[in-house]
Amino acid sequence: MPPTLLLVRHAQALHNATQDWSIHDPKLTELGEQQSRELHESLKASKIGNEVELIVVSPMRRTLQTATIGLDWMIKKGTKVMLDANWQENADKPCDTGNKISVMEAEFPQYDFSTVDPSYPDKTTNLSSNPYAFTEKAILARGQTCLKALYDRPEKVIAVVSHSGFLRTAVCNRMFFNADWRVFTFDEDAMAKSAEKKFILKESEETEKKGGGMGRSDVGVFGITENDFPPEVQDQMKDEEAKGPAKAEELDEVNKQKPT
């Protein structure tokens, strides 16, 4: 039987508070640290929180900090932590781009970074084949990659600490307030009817009606909007695919020269 998923959004980070998207891989604010402590209390008091057998975390700074503070009690009792670049945020702005693995290993020596894709945090080269590219095609595929990997896991309950944009557009079509959490199961009936054989989640009635486990998130279904993915990137990817490797390399060089 596939696992139940406890999906968590990271707590408030500097870019959330300042609306400054130029901050590279921002850390949590003081409020974010407090939200993480509240997450700790909320999950520890819940039945599902005490059933978690695996923790999957995006290797970005804000998600690692949220897990370190909010899920510390799970970690201290021996729950395995697995870092996975597939759960990183969508965009290629500095705030949504991670640091080199060597940098993060020095900051978070308690975690094993050997499971992180060596190409992380690159999102801008070879757009047509880069699994982390900021394109609708790549992000939706990445969401399915994440769900397939968890569907096949032996654990009964898995917690994931990720990002609002990725969770909403590619995983579960829900909004998450900072440090809030929701519970999902795999919707086997919907999956069986899916012509594309997609992995589809169904939210628990409790967190759906409440607006997250802490009741801080918007209620409802929220899909992809026209502003989620830049049209110029989508057009550029099509251009790469149409004109072949030589054109792709040329476009990569142009990307590197663009201001961020």
Question: Where on the chain are the PLM-derived regions?
Answer:
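Acidic, low-complexity terminal tails and accessory targeting/binding regions
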Residues: M1-T4, S46, A91-Q110, R168-T260
